[in-house]
Amino acid sequence: MLGIIGGSGLYNLPGIKVKEEVQVKTPFGEPSSPVVIAEVEGKKVAFLARHGRGHEYPPHLVPYRANLWALREVGVKRVLGISAVGGINELLMPGDFVVIHDYLDFTKTRRSTYYEGKFSVKVEGEDKVAKLLREGKVVHVDMSEAYCPEMRKVLIQILKEKNFRFHPKGVYACTEGPRFETPSEIKMLKLLGADVVGMTGYPEVALARELTMCYASLCVVANPAAGIAGYRLTSNEVIQLMKRKEEEIKEVVLKFIKELPEIRSCDCEKSLEGAEV
């Protein structure tokens, strides 16, 4: 099953049939929202609001571990994360889609792994994840190809067919937030190779990898980053841009649900092979 993490507006996809709403209790706390299980074109899909339905969770306090675990509990094997970002690369314009291929992590206070050695939370189950946690193993997952190539390929093809302005690659720099970045920080990120900057892309991608899930990130450039814009940044600007792009986002997501193959042909599910110490 596919899981989608984004805004609650995605629950209103054309043709969606909501089947149930599940309040999942996880060993890592409460997720930021109930998981909505729906059916689209005969396929089951799980939706989760990253910041909560009323946007109650700032980026540094989103319960990322609980969110990914909750999706795992309802049977999700693939996750599509949707988010707004600031543009660092001058080729990026407000409203552009970006299919992320790599990231830089500049977060500070977030719990970004399930595998904490002897301090790991012990869980029930006979799968590899549960066994590693019960045994208190230290795990180092490979992030050479952090985002699922199969999911990225489908997203890129859809964006081409829709003729939406998009970029097939992009490096996402994740900062702690909730404040916006300074112009000097953006200069630094640009020198390090970042194309976009956001506050929620990490640790979602790494946690999904630790759970052997596929993960892809579809970003929308909401505004130029600090120092590039030449004006004061506001949250309202981001909100208004995302509202204008809402229908296009829904079009992409709906087609993605339809066209994503049922059976995985990538290596994401092998992420724990050789990873334990």
From Swiss-Prot:
Keywords noted in UniProt: Glycosyltransferase, Purine salvage, Transferase
GO BP, one annotated term: purine ribonucleoside salvage
Residues the record lists as binding phosphate: 8, 50-51, 83-84, 200
EC number(s) reported in the record: 2.4.2.1
Annotated site, Important for substrate specificity, chain positions: 181, 235
Top EC class, one word: transferase
InterPro entries, A to Z: MTAP, Nucleoside_phosphorylase_d, Nucleoside_phosphorylase_sf, Purine_phosphorylase-2_CS
UniProt keyword Transferase present: yes
Known catalytic reactions: a purine D-ribonucleoside + phosphate = a purine nucleobase + alpha-D-ribose 1-phosphate
GO cellular component, as recorded: cytosol
Family of this protein: Belongs to the PNP/MTAP phosphorylase family. MTAP subfamily.
Name of the protein this chain belongs to: Probable 6-oxopurine nucleoside phosphorylase
Protein source organism: Aquifex aeolicus (strain VF5)
